[in-house]
Amino acid sequence: MKLLMLCREPNLYSCRRLKMTAENAGHKMDILDPNRFLLKIQENRPHFALYYQPNQGTPYLLPDYDAVIPRFGTQSTKMGCSVLTHLAAKNIPCLNNPASFALARDKWLSLQALAAANIAVPVTVFAGQDFQAGSAVEKVSSPTILKTLNGSQGIGVILADRSQSAVSIMETLTLSHIPVLLQDFIGEAGASDIRCFVIGDKVVAAMQRSGQKGEFRANCHRGGITQQITLSDDEKLIAVRAAQALGLDVAGVDLIQSKKGLLVLEVNASPGLEMIEKTSGIDVATQMIAYLEKKIAGL
């Protein structure tokens, strides 16, 4: 089969692992930058055409693919999801589908979807730009977490120790036209969370992440430490439910333990493979390609 991966950085561990695994399974895989696409809607069939601009040379019409794996970063979400939508319109299976991918990339909309599915999440508020910052901050506890809507890898997440600081940060971001969420800080978790890697209807791998001393974020890209963990049945169930609530085939679901019980922090539609594979010792890439093969076959 001929597969396509949408990714700006083909040398990343996850991209290299998936390409190698796909090729070992007898498939061909192209890795293309979504920002180098031109999308065309035309009268004659096929109505959806895609052109690609290589680093050198002239643009060319892309062939049809058997399936596509989106691995683009947050800065490419708009164009990446447009490319995905174009491919989906040609009935090409996407792992994940464009609507679910876009939903997961928006922290507020994804939290709304989780809450609508009766999945517990931290207390969170999202205020319009004309809503008074002080009144918004009063609706959550202090210390307060502030998050931009589209950050990743811990970027765009701020901890305000005092309410006054939260107000000041919120006002500054609002003035810069940067939408921000306010969220309860789960201090009892001790800067630790659980990353669950979900494929289909099961958790295939998991790890516990802990932030460095003095760091409230547990993300690996912020220097977090990982270790193996055995999940309870409840943790597995919540992780799968969270992925399904967003309509994702593949997801990285982040869980955190609070005084009120287990909460879902967020759901990642393009979770990294490097730390989860190295920590758990599980070959996640092979399971992703196997799942994609079944999806293509309609199983």
Swiss-Prot record:
GO cellular component: cytoplasm
Protein name: Probable alpha-L-glutamate ligase
Gene transcribed to yield this protein: rimK
Superkingdom classification of source: Bacteria
Binding-site list for Mg(2+) 1: 254, 266
Residues that hold Mn(2+) 2 according to the record: 266, 268
Family: Belongs to the RimK family.
Iron-sulfur keyword on record: no
Residues annotated to bind ATP: 147, 184-185, 193, 217-219
Cofactor(s) of this protein: Mg(2+); Mn(2+)
Residues reported to bind Mn(2+) 1: 254, 266
Organism: Mannheimia succiniciproducens (strain KCTC 0769BP / MBEL55E)
Domain ATP-grasp: 111-293
EC primary class: ligase
